[in-house]
Design a protein with these regions (language model features):
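Exposed, interaction-prone extracellular/peripheral surfaces
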Residues: 353-357, 377-391, 408-411, 417
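Active-site donor-binding acidic/aromatic loop of nucleotide-activated sugar
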Residues: 423-427
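Glycine- and other small-residue-rich loops at beta-strand/loop junctions that grip anionic moieties
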Residues: 182, 370-371, 405
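Catalytic-core elements of nucleic-acid end-processing and repair enzymes
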Residues: 434
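N-terminal localization/anchoring segments of enzymes in phospholipid and broader phosphate metabolism
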Residues: 1-352, 356, 360, 400, ...
């Protein structure tokens, strides 16, 4: 008995999903290397080399004509030029935005069938100033996410502030609970949520969970779905990792959404894992942000969740059962416009919203982002805003979770600083919030990082707040956070020749990161 527990832990560890995945990927790489070096000799190796180089050339030609973000294309073309033998294969594994036909057709069919559920109701944007009207119209017309009044919002400046409110709202659920997260990990935070979900499911509440299979790979046991389904909690592990078929899969579900009875919704950067509420310490203090909305605007997230769900487990033909008839609507507090972004179309919703806010800013614009890997268009928008006198500030982590990505983020500092952008690093720990606020009139709280993967490859979500009181709450949070940060100066960006070369290489590899 003394040795039983360590032995069980050892076998559980070596049989965990992440261990199996790493081993299978390593075996795949070893097999490919063996095929190339052992089986391809002489003429055969010349043919294989020619095929790989030809593949890289075809992908470069494909990228040149593709309607895609120019910086993203140039990054991949440069990488393929640097590694012509492997560049094409790397693009297919890591960079290809084109989803499987099956995934695209499923999502498009569901979204088209429920397009009328996203219709803009008249009079909802009345009273918006000129600077706000354009971005709201864009989200309505090109994102199909209507704007709403009669919605209250509450901003949370950290996970431990949001968590009790989330639990309290889950306890009040009477009809449905929908959850969609990138990371679900066993621990205190998930246990508190799971206990309520189990009770509510036993009471007949419709409980559903979508989680990203890759994001949750480390945190969940192999039998998680079976356990949840036995408790009448329906689950979809999105885009399951199949290591023998691909080295990595794009199109991760990076969204964070909770919808309760169609009346209350949550979003932000906070996943269901202990570090997000600082129940455990990882990379110092974990600074995040969340948003609770209640009222008419919740409908956008309800439809977003149901569209995603029905693409994989078709269930509802009519969403109206999930649209509550609110006897008393909340007083209007500006406009609230929840939205989502998808890699399945060619519309870069997340990036366009940020670009519009920057273009319309006159006094200030602040960003929270854990990562910075941006294209020329976003880089120019930040610099141009600063050059015309706007107070542009970026807040990033002081303690990184990924050191190479942090180094990549810092490689963008100098051109921004020289244009007048002010950059801060959050010294108490890791800043994971993804927010933007401008001119006391517009803000975004959501799951969207300022990097290639969020802007172009992942499923993301956010809430646009226009002339809403929580715009000021986010502004005040940023201003309270700045004294806890170290402001970066141009002198801090001197890296020497070796550092400059490393930064250049990381820029080339940025589409992979």
């Amino acid at each position: 008995m003394l040795f039983r527990l360590p032995i069980v832990k050892f076998f559980n560890r070596i049989l965990s999903r992440i261990t199996v995945t790493v081993v299978l990927v390593a075996l795949q790489l070893a097999w490919l290397a063996w095929v190339f070096f052992a089986l391809t000799t002489g003429t055969a190796r010349v043919w294989v080399t020619g095929v790989l180089n030809g593949l890289s050339l075809l992908i470069v030609l494909y990228l040149v004509r593709k309607d895609e973000n120019s910086a993203y294309k140039v990054g991949w073309i440069a990488l393929i030029g640097l590694l012509p033998l492997l560049g094409g294969a790397l693009y297919l594994a890591f960079g290809n935005k084109r989803p499987s036909r099956r995934l695209r057709s499923k999502m498009q069919a569901v979204e088209q069938a429920h397009r009328t559920d996203r219709a803009q109701q008249p009079g909802q944007t009345a009273g918006l100033c000129d600077e706000n009207r354009g971005v709201s119209r864009y989200l309505t017309q090109y994102g199909c996410y209507p704007a709403w009044q009669n919605t209250t919002a509450r901003y949370f400046s950290c996970g431990e502030a949001m968590y009790p409110a989330l639990l309290a709202d889950l306890e009040k659920a009477e009809k449905s609970i929908f959850l969609e997260f990138f990371i679900v990990s066993q621990g205190k935070m998930w246990q508190g949520v799971e206990d309520i979900l189990r009770r509510k499911a036993a009471q007949g509440v419709d409980v559903r969970l979508i989680y990203d299979d890759f994001g949750s790979l480390l945190g969940l046991p192999k039998d998680f779905v079976v356990r949840m389904e036995r408790a009448h909690i329906r689950c979809i592990p999105f885009n399951p990792v199949v290591p023998l078929l691909s080295l990595v899969m794009n199109h991760r579900d990076h969204r964070k959404i909770v919808v309760i009875d169609g009346k209350v919704a949550y979003t932000g950067g906070i996943n269901l894992a202990d570090e997000y509420i600082n129940a455990i310490t990882r990379f110092g203090y974990w600074k995040d942000a969340g948003l609770r909305i209640e009222g008419a605007a919740v409908w956008n997230f309800t439809v977003t969740f149901l569209d995603f769900w029905n693409a994989f487990r078709p269930f509802e033909q009519d969403y109206s059962a999930f649209r509550p008839q609110l006897a008393v609507l909340p007083d209007s507090d500006g406009v609230v416009q929840p939205y989502a972004d998808s890699p399945l179309d060619e519309e870069p919703v997340a990036e366009t919203v940020y670009l519009d806010i920057l273009a319309q800013s006159q006094q200030y614009v602040y960003f929270y982002t854990p990562y910075l890997a941006i294209g020329e268009e976003m880089l120019d928008a930040l610099r141009n805003a600063a050059k015309r006198g706007v107070d542009v500030r970026l807040v990033l982590p002081g303690i990184p979770d990924k050191k190479l990505v942090f180094r990549l983020s810092r490689s963008y500092y100098l051109p921004l600083l020289r244009a007048g952008v002010r950059i801060y690093e959050y010294t108490p720990g890791f800043l994971h919030a993804k927010c933007c606020v401008s001119d006391d009139r517009a803000a975004v709280v959501g799951s969207i990082n300022m990097d290639y993967r969020s802007m172009f490859l992942h499923f993301e979500c956010g809430v646009l707040l226009l002339q809403n009181s929580q715009v000021l709450a986010l502004r005040d949070d940023v201003r309270r956070t700045l004294p806890q940060c170290r402001e970066v100066q141009c002198a801090d960006c001197r890296t020497g020749l070796a550092g400059t070369v490393l930064d250049s290489v990381l820029r080339l590899l940025s589409p992979l990161m």
